[in-house]
């Protein structure tokens, strides 16, 4: 039912009052102050700016319920979430996950990536639901693939510019 509705109506049509019980639960059960103050671990959440199409990475210190909601706002199901006057959708469109901030901010030697959606599929989707699912999968995976390619190119350039440098 929701699947069919989301193809015929936008979330602005079928949820005119913008009621979202998930936000209420997040605000009630997540201690954002504790998250912001916990400096033993870095946390980044990504959202996609609707106007520019660019990724915005929110660091641990700036994470709020709105940031969490924006980072998971699929545009065919949820309204864009406004943060500082700008509308945001799911961060998966532009950074799924955003790897470069982890490396550039922390100088991490290693990053563990857990892939939750396959980049490749052997079957050809034939139903409307499967086609939409695959389109979303490709869209969400393309940002990761682009970042991985950028890392490979960066390592290659470093090796050429600094022959004695060891890159893993």
Whereabouts are the PLM-identified features?
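Active-site glycine-rich loop that binds ribose-phosphate moieties when present
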Residues: 23-33, 65, 69-80, 91-99
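A short alpha-helix-loop-beta-strand transition element characteristic
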Residues: 30-42
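Short, structured loop/turn "capping" segments at alpha-beta junctions
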Residues: 36-37, 78-79, 110-112
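Non-catalytic peripheral regions of patatin-like phospholipases
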Residues: 1-25, 48-50, 59-63, 86, ...
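A short, Trp-centered hydrophobic/proline-enriched beta-strand micro-motif
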Residues: 43-47
């Amino acid at each position: 039912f929701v699947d069919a509705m989301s193809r015929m109506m936008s979330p602005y049509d079928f949820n005119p009052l913008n009621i979202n019980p998930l936000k209420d639960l997040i605000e009630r059960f997540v201690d954002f102050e504790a998250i912001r103050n916990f400096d033993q671990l870095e946390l980044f959440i990504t959202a996609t700016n609707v106007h520019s199409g660019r990724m915005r990475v929110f660091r641990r210190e700036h994470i709020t319920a709105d940031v969490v909601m924006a980072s998971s706002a699929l545009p065919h199901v949820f309204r864009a979430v406004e943060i500082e006057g700008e509308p945001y959708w799911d961060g998966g469109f532009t950074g799924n996950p955003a790897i470069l901030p982890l490396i550039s901010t922390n100088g991490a030697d290693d990053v563990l990536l857990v892939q939750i959606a396959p980049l490749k599929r052997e079957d050809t989707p034939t139903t409307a639901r499967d086609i939409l699912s695959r389109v979303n999968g490709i869209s969400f995976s393309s940002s990761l693939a682009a970042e991985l390619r950028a890392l490979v190119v960066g390592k290659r350039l470093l090796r050429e510019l600094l022959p004695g440098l060891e890159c893993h």
